Every structure is written in C-alpha cells, then in structure tokens.
C-alpha cells in the first residue's frame, strides 16, 4: 500500500511539471506518505477504548469544560489543513471522564479527513454515548486553508460550529452557562 501511495505522489509531481528525481523531491513521496499516515491516524483509534479506561465514579453533577483544545485536521474536499480550537463540555451522570481523554477524543476525530461540521458532531456524539453524560456541548472555531489559500482567498476568516446534546439542548440556562464560560475564558489567560 505504501508503494502505491508513493507512486501516486510521484505521478502528481510529474503532472504539475516537477522532476520527482531531483534532489529536493527524491524523498518527498515517502515523506508525504508518513505525513498522511500520521494525519489520518484517527481511523485506527477506538473511541470506546480511549474513554472506557478513563471513566471514574463521581457525585459531581456540574458542568465540566475543557476549552481551547488546539487541533488540526484535513479538509476532505481539498486535502488542505484546517485548524483551530475546540471547547468541549459535559454534565456527568455518576461518572467523570479523565481530563486528558477529552483532548484525545478531539484528536481521534480530527486525525481523519473531515469537514468541521461533522467533526463537531462526532465529538459530541462520542462523548454523549461513551460517557453516558446528561448532556454535551461542543464548539469549534477554526481557520480553513481551502478558504484562505484558494477559492475566495479570505485570510484569517474563522468558522464556528456547535453541537449540543441532552440537557445542553433542552435547558437554556445550562446552554447560557456553557457559552458564558467559553466567552469569559477568552479574556483570561494564565
């Protein structure tokens, strides 16, 4: 499979008018293969395994928010990067998730070919289902190189998506608290 991938990269270089045998490009097919292997490693990771090993009994029934989770992903339409920050909150239902697992969850889905809307939904759904949470809220703010480098070429534009589940969808007060915590956090840095 690796050889087939590298041959495709070599062909692409030839099609755009490059010499894949010149010094600077000779190892490019292998480098691109390794990069894509890493950037799409989310396909080989199991969400249940990541979260189920880190669910802990707790009487906490208040919101848990992990904000400013930096991520990068590849747009499934152009294979160009998009990157930004995810804010993930949930309300526990007798169990809390190990805090490091929430960024890992974001990473699992970000390391796949994606669109931001789907990424947001997948994170929310996976946390809701696997943590048996009372509710989940996910907001992602990202910059897309397919928008900035090609097409409309609008540098520094940001796309924001949200996904709400359970009590976050049904209870306006909880939703407001979630949005307030995210917005107030932008003012304060440690």
UniProtKB/Swiss-Prot annotation:
Keywords: GTP-binding, Hydrolase, Metal-binding, Nucleotide-binding, One-carbon metabolism, Zinc. Its EC number is 3.5.4.16. Zn(2+) binds at residues 75, 78, 146. InterPro entries: GTP-CH-I_C/QueF, GTP-CH-I_N, GTP_CycHdrlase_I, GTP_CycHdrlase_I_CS, GTP_CycHdrlase_I_dom. Coiled coil: none annotated. GO terms for molecular function: GTP binding; GTP cyclohydrolase I activity; zinc ion binding. Pathway: Cofactor biosynthesis; 7,8-dihydroneopterin triphosphate biosynthesis; 7,8-dihydroneopterin triphosphate from GTP: step 1/1. One of its GO terms (biological process) is tetrahydrobiopterin biosynthetic process. Pfam families: GTP_cyclohydroI. It catalyses: GTP + H2O = 7,8-dihydroneopterin 3'-triphosphate + formate + H(+). One of its GO terms (cellular component) is cytoplasm. PANTHER family: GTP CYCLOHYDROLASE 1, GTP CYCLOHYDROLASE I. Belongs to the GTP cyclohydrolase I family. Toroid-shaped homodecamer, composed of two pentamers of five dimers. HAMAP family: FolE. This is GTP cyclohydrolase 1. It comes from Campylobacter jejuni subsp. doylei (strain ATCC BAA-1458 / RM4099 / 269.97). The lineage of its organism: Bacteria, Pseudomonadati, Campylobacterota, Epsilonproteobacteria, Campylobacterales.
